Amino acid sequence: MQSHEPHPGMTVRVKAGHWKSKFDGMRGTVEHRWGHPHHLALDVLLEDGRLQLFWFHELEKA
C-alpha cells in the first residue's frame, strides 16, 4: 500500500510488530486521514469498536 491509497472506508490491518502488540493483526476501517502524504496518520475504527490513531507505515491493506 502506498501513502496516497488509504481513504475513509478502506479496510486495513495493523502490521505485526506494532509497538503496542495488542493491536497486532487487528482489522479496522479508516475513518480520517491527517497530515502530509509523507507523514500520514490515520484514524482507524478497529474491529473491537475503539478508534485509534496509527501512522501509515504501521498498517497494511486488509
Give the predicted meaning of each segment.
Residues 7-62:
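Basic/aromatic-rich interaction segments and small domains that mediate binding to polyanionic partners
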